Amino acid sequence: MKRALFLLVSVLLPFMLWAQQERMMFGDTSRVGVPYSKDPHVINFNGTYYMYYSIPPKNWSKTEGWGVGVATSTDLVNWNRVGEITTASVGNPDMKGMCAPCALVLEGKVHLFYQSYGSGKRDAICHAVSSDGVRFVADRSNPIYRPEEADWTCGRAIDAEVTKYKGRYFLYFATRDPAYKIQQQGVAVAKGDTDFSAGSWTTACDKPILAPVYDWEGLCIEGASICYKGKKMYMFYAGSYNNAPQQIGVAVSRDGIHWKRLSAEPFKRNGKPGEWNSSESGHPHLFTDVDGRTYLFYQGNNDKGKTWYITQEEVLWKHGKPYLKSEQ
């Protein structure tokens, strides 16, 4: 009996270890000495996966702002840091910081959309372009977009998500209400032949397209990420502020402006006490690979934000609704 049990463990152990190793857990330690990576966005560029993510000031320096880290992978699991993008390197040295990247591959180049950071209500969406995915040149017209102040927005724009739908580009962004208390989603549009510069974008709706409603969404909807299935757009979004806990929801639309939640409950919850993501599962990015498979990248931690890791899970679809492969 003992010999049979030993043989069984010997056979299964390599597969168990392989399964454990296949769980992506990425944390960039270059800035503050501990894993600290947020706001992931992934593209397939020239056959290699590139992940862009937010990194904090070096050693929490008060004179240096947030930046964007760059990592590459061939399997979406194992990632190597290959560089970083800063306000100085991109050509916007007057900005206090930059973070929350969104990347788009067009005609052999990577277009990076990111937010200025550190200016409160004046934070806005910016744009830069790269030929190699690592070295970027900023748009001379930066910032390219922020909404005008109105009864629903203070004029701030962060967490850009840019996508093309029905011949137009949609720029999804998070903004605060005039009291700077509630975070909610807005959207701007541009023509299909846009160069993404300032002046190209028009706010598409004079109210939030998605605002917090359910208890789990708290006072915040942010971090929108878009994918397509059939004639529908799906938005994966973060509900509630960081570590409240933040969790992930899904909404659906046929026009990119009017959205309906798929459920009153989170699609991806924070982990149970003791698990790596017990403080949150947040700021999603839904990556669609060239073969059509979809993966949910998101950030998490279990120490109220002292560290931040990025992971991913494959998303499967049935009857127009997504579900996690790990939970099937």
Which residue ranges define each predicted feature?
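C-terminal transmembrane module of eukaryotic multi-pass membrane proteins
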Residues: H283-P284, Y298
